[in-house]
UniProtKB/Swiss-Prot annotation:
Pyrrolidone carboxylic acid: residues bearing it: 24
UniProt function note: Chemotactic factor that attracts monocytes. This protein can bind heparin.
Protein name: C-C motif chemokine 8
CDD domains in UniProt: Chemokine_CC
UniProt signal peptide: 1-23
Keyword Disulfide bond found: yes
Protein keywords: Chemotaxis, Cytokine, Disulfide bond, Heparin-binding, Inflammatory response, Pyrrolidone carboxylic acid, Secreted, Signal
SMART domains: SCY (SM00199)
GO molecular function: CCR chemokine receptor binding; chemokine activity; heparin binding
Statement: the UniProt record of this protein carries the keyword Secreted: yes
Location in or out of the cell: Secreted
Disulfide pairings: 34-59, 35-75
Length: 99
């Protein structure tokens, strides 16, 4: 009787862990980066180096994370015109061949 109770406990534990892994597969192996606050003002383009779009459904809001030349990360609203323009310019800059 003790063996079957232990086996049942082991099976329930395994089943519970399996559903957690299946329900949230990206939380197991990939860390999630979210923005909880957005910058109010415009960041000059000359200070920007790159960007990353945050569209993860587990984050409270969509955002763009700009990496500055000073190696800082700043969250911005992707709906703002200056953010969209900066992303376009950074895309063009990254596609321009360097001599």
């Amino acid at each position: 009787m003790q063996v079957s109770a232990a086996l049942l406990c082991l099976l329930l534990t395994t089943a519970a862990f399996s559903t957690q892994v299946l329900a949230q597969p990206d939380s197991v192996s990939i860390p999630i980066t979210c923005c909880f606050g957005l910058v109010n003002g415009k960041i000059p383009f000359k200070k920007l180096e790159s960007y990353t779009r945050i569209t993860n459904s587990q984050c409270p809001q969509e955002a763009v994370i700009f990496k500055t030349k000073a190696d800082k990360e700043v969250c911005a609203d992707p709906q703002q015109k200056w953010v969209q323009n900066s992303m376009k310019l950074l895309d063009q800059k990254s596609q321009t061949p360097k001599p």
